[in-house]
């Protein structure tokens, strides 16, 4: 399981040092092979272990290239998809187009989301968390059947 939020400094080449607690698991789970793409709803990146990404690709493959919305989704997610491999020091190289899309500079946040990570600029992450917390009192919790029975 991928969870937690970790502040990480990108090096000058755009490499992200994956926290030690995930390195062994990623090497065991997917031989250190990952895929990074853009998030179409937020200014961040999505980083999937290869086995998880392959499930996403199956879903994308089932979409119709004739439907403009489905085609746009395929184009963005697959067009930006970039294979990444953990190097010997547990780092991943994030391509310049991906870093540019998410506005990544020096300080980033690696945020576990169960089956994937989100990669945010630290500034945007803090803004997003602030917005999410402020929106909580106004949310309609009955909107989703899954949320209706959700408790912490």
From Swiss-Prot:
Belongs to the MraZ family. Disulfide bonds: none annotated. GO terms for biological process: negative regulation of DNA-templated transcription initiation. It holds the Pfam family MraZ. Residues 5-52, 81-124 form the SpoVT-AbrB domain. It is found in: Cytoplasm, Nucleoid. This is Transcriptional regulator MraZ. InterPro entries: MraZ, MraZ_C, MraZ_dom, MraZ_N, MraZ_sf, SpoVT-AbrB_dom, SpoVT-AbrB_sf. Forms oligomers. SUPFAM superfamilies: AbrB/MazE/MraZ-like. It comes from the Bacteria. GO terms for molecular function: DNA-binding transcription factor activity; transcription cis-regulatory region binding. The keyword S-adenosyl-L-methionine does not apply. It comes from Tolumonas auensis (strain DSM 9187 / NBRC 110442 / TA 4). Keywords: Cytoplasm, DNA-binding, Repeat, Transcription, Transcription regulation. GO terms for cellular component: cytoplasm; nucleoid.
């Amino acid at each position: 399981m991928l969870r937690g939020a970790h502040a990480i400094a990108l090096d000058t080449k755009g490499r992200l040092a994956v926290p030690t607690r995930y390195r062994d698991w990623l090497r065991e789970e997917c031989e250190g092979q990952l895929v990074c793409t853009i998030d179409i709803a937020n200014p961040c990146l999505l980083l999937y272990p290869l086995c998880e990404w392959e499930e996403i690709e199956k879903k994308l493959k089932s979409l119709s290239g004739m439907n403009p919305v489905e085609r746009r989704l395929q184009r963005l997610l697959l067009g930006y998809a970039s294979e990444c491999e953990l190097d010997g020091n547990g780092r991943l190289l994030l391509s310049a187009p991906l870093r540019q899309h998410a506005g990544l500079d020096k300080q980033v946040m690696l945020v576990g989301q169960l089956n994937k990570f989100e990669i945010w600029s630290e500034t945007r992450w803090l803004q997003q968390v602030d917005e999410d917390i402020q929106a909580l009192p106004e949310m309609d919790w009955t909107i989703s059947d899954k949320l209706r029975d959700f408790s912490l």
